[in-house]
Amino acid sequence: MRMSLQAPRRLLELAGQSLLGDQALAISILDELPRELFPPLFVEAFTSRRCEVLKVMVQAWPFPCLPLGSLMKTPDLEILHYVVDGIDCLLAQKVRPRRWKLQVLELRDVDENFWTIWSGARPLSCSPEAMSKRQTVEDCPRTGEKQPLKVFMDVCLKEKFMDEDLSFFSGWVQHRRGSVHLCCTKVVNYSMSILNFRNILETVYPDSIQVLEIWNMCWPCMIVEFSRYLSQMRNLRKLFISDGCRYLLSSDSQEQLVAEFSSVLLRLEYLQMLYVRRVCFFRGHLDQLIRCLRSPLETLALTYGFLEKVDLKCLPRYPSLSQLKQLNLSHGALRFIRLEPLRALLEKVAATLQTLFLVDCGIRDSKLRVILPALSCCSNLTTFCFHGNDTSMDGLKDLLRHTGRLSNLSLETYPAPRESLDDRGRVISELLTPLQAELMRILREVREPKRIFFGPVSCPCCGTSPTEQLEFNFCLWGRPA
């Protein structure tokens, strides 16, 4: 049975190899080639770098999407040039060919199944016939005016200037403005200058951006410049801004920046995740920002000294924070702030909260006791990170008794008890070991923990040692490795 299923596939493969042996013939008969032959023939031409064949195949591609990114694990500028040349030939025609189907050039590595399906790797569950049925609606010819071709790629800017691939596509899209849209669901800028970043934002189709991360929001003027583009990103789901504390501003300038940014948030009706990391522009004005959120957030991260008393006080007030699934207030210097507002917020989101980060917040026993009743009601909590705080053995015992009922917890981190530290705050392992055993005994009286860490430990997500960087947010909440 297996031979009978695989044999036709093998014959198609051999036919494709034979056809590519005569490049002129292959090009001449593409219009009559069965669509089942296109994917294996394209893979063969791609592997053997028959660039002229690829160029012509793009023009006759019989599917709505060409998932080139899953074939090209690393960008190949030569092949990209030939593919774009083929598309240009199509776009230059006033009357589109009969077999015109291509609507999307996918440069992300997201659709490897397409090639395995058509190469026969899964002939039973995903046959060409089944694939054809799924694409019936997509393959229907469009009527009316020509739709722009969409080119999908993610943008990660780690240098001050664009790399060759991005520069090439940026120039091509600008040349073909109106007929080609550069769509980037994710745009990340680590270090590119504001001028070059502006050029990128002017090229990318703004409605396509769903995730935007800016790690160098250091210039006040960048907020104003950036806001103009941000307001056009109507489908933005995640916004991350970092490092905006390099310059001190006058109160008038700060109020102007807050007003500018608040007006932008009013336009982002689909925003679900907001991360503000080491940004001082908004300190003391969080109320104004939260008030402008159009829809409930799933994730709120305000980290590295962002919060003041007035900021924390406003958090429980607004409906936009009533359905939080993730909350991160790490490195927030909460030692001198009353935590009753945090308790009120935890009570409000007790039914939805899944992840809570209160890392290195300066929370001592008296502050901890304020939030414990609310914390014990967060029945869906799966991750709780509390390490880096100044907590005694009695405080940790009380904390574990309150979290003992949280049966969904799969990851929890706690500081070493104060009694196990020396005068410099370093852990004395001989003291920590028996205290840790006692804490585990107390917890096991109510539930069996899954992953639990006390004191300085390696990150359970990536293994990085916190002796160098005590941040658990670099895996789940911060900059990727």
Swiss-Prot record:
Cross-referenced InterPro entries: LRR_dom_sf, PRAME, PRAME_domain
Domain of life the protein comes from: Eukaryota
Gene Ontology CC entries for this record: Cul2-RING ubiquitin ligase complex; cytoplasm
Record-level GO BP terms: negative regulation of apoptotic process; negative regulation of cell differentiation; negative regulation of DNA-templated transcription; positive regulation of cell population proliferation; proteasome-mediated ubiquitin-dependent protein catabolic process
GO molecular function: ubiquitin-like ligase-substrate adaptor activity
The LRR repeat ranges on this chain: 99-126, 181-205, 206-232, 233-267, 268-293, 294-325, 326-344, 350-377, 378-402
Disulfide bonds: none
Alphabetized UniProt keyword annotations: Leucine-rich repeat, Repeat
Family: Belongs to the PRAME family.
Name of this protein: PRAME family member 22
